[in-house]
């Protein structure tokens, strides 16, 4: 079976099953499907897949609740990061500060000084990536910033205190320091390699149901890698 046949088989499976996924997060839930189908639609230029991604995106935002966690894997930070990825990479159009205003406020409600979990999926590292990606998205000279100075200072202090626990390839400490110094890298766009390793080999199971549907060790991760290799554009 060719890579295209394998990809088509996975894509059909994702389209059928994503609307029924209860989790709305990026790494394990529907937002992973949103990101994938916007990316795939852009690759092949088919409006049908844009429409599908729009539908899935709306279902994610209408499912947000007051108790939706803020973590990256299953919560607001991952959803918000995916929105920035989609908009900054030209996969859809919109104003990120309008779309993400409520998410930013919920993220700032969490006292970062009390965070003991340093992990990417559920802890400080995922929050850092989201906040930094937001502040690097475009030059807001003369405009309100999504996060206030005191929050950024507290976040940097916590990150620096735990710098040995953070993934070096994301350069989170340096990027946040540059933001504090009013010199964020606006040219840096969110990349899929920020959240998954693209160097790992891809193994497609015969039974697609044997893997979770999402990005984290799942079928959507495989689909992203297969399409990315074909397009050489992740």
Where are the language model's segments positioned?
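Extended ligand-binding groove/face enriched in aromatic
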Residues: 51-146
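Alpha-helical scaffold segments in carbohydrate-active enzymes
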Residues: 13, 39, 59, 78, ...
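Solvent-exposed loop and edge beta-strand segments that line ligand/cofactor-binding
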Residues: 14-30, 62-75, 111-124, 157-177, ...
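Small-side-chain structural scaffolding
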Residues: 7, 11, 31-34, 53, ...
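Specific register positions within alpha-helical solenoid repeats of the TPR/Sel1-like families, i.e.
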Residues: 35-38, 42, 81-84, 88, ...
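Internal amphipathic alpha-helical repeat/solenoid segments
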Residues: 3-72
């Amino acid at each position: 079976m060719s890579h295209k046949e394998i990809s088509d088989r996975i894509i059909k499976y994702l389209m059928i099953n994503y609307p029924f996924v209860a989790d709305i997060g990026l790494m394990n839930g529907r937002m992973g499907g949103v990101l994938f189908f916007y990316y795939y639609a852009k690759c092949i230029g088919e409006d049908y897949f844009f429409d599908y991604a729009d539908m899935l995106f709306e279902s994610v935002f209408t499912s947000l609740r007051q108790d939706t966690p803020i973590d990256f894997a299953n919560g607001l930070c991952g959803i918000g990061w995916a929105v920035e990825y989609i908009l900054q990479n030209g996969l859809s159009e919109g104003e990120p500060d309008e779309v993400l205003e409520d998410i930013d406020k919920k993220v700032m409600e969490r006292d970062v000084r009390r965070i003991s979990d340093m992990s990417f999926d559920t802890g400080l590292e995922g929050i850092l990536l989201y906040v930094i990606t937001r502040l690097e998205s475009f030059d807001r000279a003369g405009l309100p910033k999504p996060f206030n100075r005191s929050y950024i200072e507290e976040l940097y202090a916590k990150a620096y205190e735990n710098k040995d626990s953070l993934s070096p390839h994301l350069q989170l400490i340096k990027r946040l320091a540059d933001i504090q110094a009013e010199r964020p890298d606006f040219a840096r766009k969110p990349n899929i390699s920020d959240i998954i390793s693209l160097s790992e080999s891809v193994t497609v199971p015969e039974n697609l149901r044997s893997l979770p549907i999402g990005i984290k060790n799942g079928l959507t991760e495989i689909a992203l890698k297969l399409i990315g290799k074909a397009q050489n554009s992740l």
